[in-house]
């Protein structure tokens, strides 16, 4: 199954959780925080402005992004994988290599 988000929505695959701290301590699954980074896997057509124009999104498929800890409260399961659906304005930054 493939998701096609509407308007200014973005579908994100969350990055893998860190299971070890910088000091080398292994964290159990319940203690590890969910990462607030991910990869954009689908984008909508754009934000519809008050005048009816559509503004293209600033993110694109494949972008690595950072989002807030409470962003993406809408989780959907697609082919056994949990994906986040959020508005573009919930994305804080694009990670550039």
UniProtKB/Swiss-Prot annotation:
Q: Could you tell me the keywords of this UniProt record?
A: Chaperone, Cytoplasm
Compartments in which it is found: Cytoplasm
* Database matches in Pfam families: Cpn10 (PF00166)
A single GO BP term for this record reads: chaperone cofactor-dependent protein refolding
Record's SUPFAM superfamilies?
GroES-like (SSF50129)
Chief site of localization: cytoplasm
MF (Gene Ontology):
ATP binding; metal ion binding; protein folding chaperone; protein-folding chaperone binding; unfolded protein binding
- Highest taxon above the source species: Bacteria
One GO cellular component term, please give it. cytoplasm
- Name the InterPro entries for this protein: Chaperonin_GroES, Chaperonin_GroES_sf, Chaprnonin_Cpn10_CS, GroES-like_sf
Database matches in SMART domains: Cpn10
Q: What does this protein do?
A: Together with the chaperonin GroEL, plays an essential role in assisting protein folding. The GroEL-GroES system forms a nano-cage that allows encapsulation of the non-native substrate proteins and provides a physical environment optimized to promote and accelerate protein folding. GroES binds to the apical surface of the GroEL ring, thereby capping the opening of the GroEL channel.
Q: Which HAMAP family match?
A: CH10 (MF_00580)
Question: Whom does it interact with, and what assembly results?
Answer: Heptamer of 7 subunits arranged in a ring. Interacts with the chaperonin GroEL.
The family note in this entry says: Belongs to the GroES chaperonin family.
Record-given protein name: Co-chaperonin GroES
Q: What is the lineage of its organism?
A: Bacteria, Pseudomonadati, Pseudomonadota, Gammaproteobacteria, Pseudomonadales
Query: Which gene codes for it?
Result: groES
């Amino acid at each position: 199954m493939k998701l096609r988000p509407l308007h200014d929505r973005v579908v994100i695959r969350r990055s893998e959780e860190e299971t070890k701290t910088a000091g080398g301590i292994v964290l159990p699954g319940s203690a590890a925080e969910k990462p607030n980074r991910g990869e954009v896997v689908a984008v909508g057509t754009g934000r519809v402005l008050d005048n009816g124009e559509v503004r293209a999104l600033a993110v694109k498929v494949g972008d690595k992004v950072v989002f807030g800890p409470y962003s993406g409260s809408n989780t959907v399961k697609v082919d056994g994988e949990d994906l986040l659906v959020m508005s573009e304005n919930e994305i804080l930054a694009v990670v550039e290599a």
